[in-house]
Swiss-Prot record:
Keyword field: Antioxidant, Copper, Cytoplasm, Disulfide bond, Metal-binding, Oxidoreductase, Zinc
Protein name: Superoxide dismutase [Cu-Zn]
Quaternary structure note: Homodimer.
Native source species: Ananas comosus (Pineapple)
Molecular-function annotations in GO: copper ion binding; superoxide dismutase activity
Compartments, record wording: Cytoplasm
UniProt keyword Ion transport, yes or no: no
Obligatory cofactor(s): Cu cation; Zn(2+)
Disulfides per UniProt: 56-145
Similarity comment: Belongs to the Cu-Zn superoxide dismutase family.
Length: 152
């Protein structure tokens, strides 16, 4: 089993820890919790770069090794890093539990060393008709991020 972790933080007080586990060539399970967010839906993605030198802005675009358009997690054609939305409760916290087969922890398309990002707004899953729908899901600014690192 391969395990990874990302510790999320931001200047706005958003914080959390996200865990990634993968058995063999099976899907990757994403679990953890994030606090300090405004209630509602927030886009949740793996971005291409593990670079936070300029905060979450330097994490690059969504992880997209196949060069696809943005989509929903259940879409066959999507960015590998498109994990959809997380639903934040009235207390500002969310418990994450996602199983996804496009974000492996090993091999040429591994997400180790990349970043997980929480956005300010809902991800329209590529279906909103906005000019940004097919690239970012029009999910707004980046409110928190963390680099995905290998865990022992």
């Amino acid at each position: 089993m391969v395990k990874a972790v990302a510790v999320l933080g931001s200047s706005e007080g958003v914080k959390g820890t996200i865990y990634f586990t993968q058995e063999g060539d099976g899907p990757t399970t994403v679990t953890g919790s994030i606090s300090g967010l405004k209630p509602g839906l927030h886009g949740f993605h793996v971005h291409a770069l593990g670079d936070t030198t300029n905060g979450c802005m330097s994490t690059g675009p969504h992880f997209n090794p196949a060069g696809n358009e943005h989509g929903a997690p259940e879409d066959e054609t999507r960015h590998a890093g498109d994990l959809g939305n997380v639903t934040v409760g009235e207390d500002g916290t969310v418990n994450v539990n996602i199983v996804d087969s496009q974000i492996p922890l090993s091999g040429s398309n591994s997400i180790i060393g990349r970043a997980v990002v929480v956005h300010a707004d809902p991800d329209d899953l590529g279906k909103g008709g906005h000019e940004l729908s097919k690239t970012t899901g029009n999910a707004g600014g980046r409110v928190a991020c963390g680099i995905i690192g290998l865990q022992g």
